Amino acid sequence: MRVAVVGSRTLTVPNLGDYLPENVSEIVSGGARGVDQCARAYALSHGIRLTEYLPDYARHGRRAPLMRNDLIVARAELVLAFWDGRSRGTVYTIRRCRAMGVPYRVFRAAEAPSCP
């Protein structure tokens, strides 16, 4: 299963494996700080395929992070969103999941220790 892991840059998820389904075959993320870094570290340390979409500022300007989030949602079969209650990018991604019919789960969190 292709699982997108997205979230606020102020958060980390040191126990990411607790949230992932057992049949995860690929982790999709955005290559940013915080949650995305934890997704990358988990995928690499567990031999799971990692697909990262980076914002293309040259092509999309200020909308680049949102366009990147659209690609992430389109690739995913499930989206795990870790939200700090403030991040507009995470809220945008949740709304895109709804619009595109992609299953998602939202985890509301406070700042956490860094990922391994």
Regions found by a protein language model. Name each.
Residues 1-115:
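Acidic/glycine-enriched connector segments
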